[in-house]
């Protein structure tokens, strides 16, 4: 996985709640031009749980087409880490095969949500999906959403026994897990999935981030990651601290509710539309977002 900085892309909707493909393409181009290494379509932030199978595949397709046709400032192509998560292994497997077929560089697969599988069930789930493709696979541990954690021994076993499982997105909130994973397997790539811990995870052995805030501030997220990779940790910390209030504001309600509203307020998407059961943020949250964006000089 030859990338380090990436954003968990939002999925913009039109007023009729269909996917706004033109806006989606525009957002991806902005990521490319502002220095991100990769984009992550249809993950949690992309509201994958309320997309149809056809919409899910189309979003992956748009991301791949846009990255292929838009060069980065260094004249390369931004990588696509395609989200293929589902609580049905068969559906994740189908999405993984599709993503590989149309040119995804790697896939991100969240643990099955609601089912609450055992550790053996998680092992078989990930093994089955990974063995169906040849491209790299990133595990995704976010127990606050899935109801179950990929325990450290299970994650290590998957890395050791399944050749194309190369990385894990850590959104557990536990730095202890990060240090354990890095201690036992230095080549197991760890990506931060929690913006408030980006610097801490990078300092503890992480090699990159998958950021929600990066939708709005891709340039600063990219700069922070690049500083950390060069072991310029003080500079990275300064950027992390600069983003502190924005990170806080973007998670006062369930993700991606605040980030979509922030993107709308910043003029980056026309409609801050959500599919039920997600709803628009409260008046208080909108006021907080406006104040925060003014603080960062995103809006006047």
Curated annotation (Swiss-Prot):
Name by which UniProt lists this protein: 4-hydroxy-tetrahydrodipicolinate synthase
Catalysed transformations (reactions): L-aspartate 4-semialdehyde + pyruvate = (2S,4S)-4-hydroxy-2,3,4,5-tetrahydrodipicolinate + H2O + H(+)
Residues bound to pyruvate: 45, 210
Subcellular localization(s) per the UniProt record: Cytoplasm
Cross-referenced SMART domains: DHDPS (SM01130)
Subunit structure and binding partners: Homotetramer; dimer of dimers.
Enzyme class (EC, first level): lyase
Site (Part of a proton relay during catalysis): 44, 114
Pathway per the UniProt entry: Amino-acid biosynthesis; L-lysine biosynthesis via DAP pathway; (S)-tetrahydrodipicolinate from L-aspartate: step 3/4
Organism: Helicobacter pylori (strain HPAG1)
Keywords noted in UniProt: Amino-acid biosynthesis, Cytoplasm, Diaminopimelate biosynthesis, Lyase, Lysine biosynthesis, Schiff base
GO cellular component terms listed in the entry, alphabetical order: cytosol
Gene3D superfamilies: Aldolase class I (3.20.20.70)
Gene Ontology MF term list: 4-hydroxy-tetrahydrodipicolinate synthase activity
Function according to Swiss-Prot or TrEMBL: Catalyzes the condensation of (S)-aspartate-beta-semialdehyde [(S)-ASA] and pyruvate to 4-hydroxy-tetrahydrodipicolinate (HTPA).
A biological process from GO: diaminopimelate biosynthetic process
E.C. numbers: 4.3.3.7
Family per similarity comment: Belongs to the DapA family.
Matching InterPro entries: Aldolase_TIM, DapA, DapA-like, Schiff_base-form_aldolases_AS
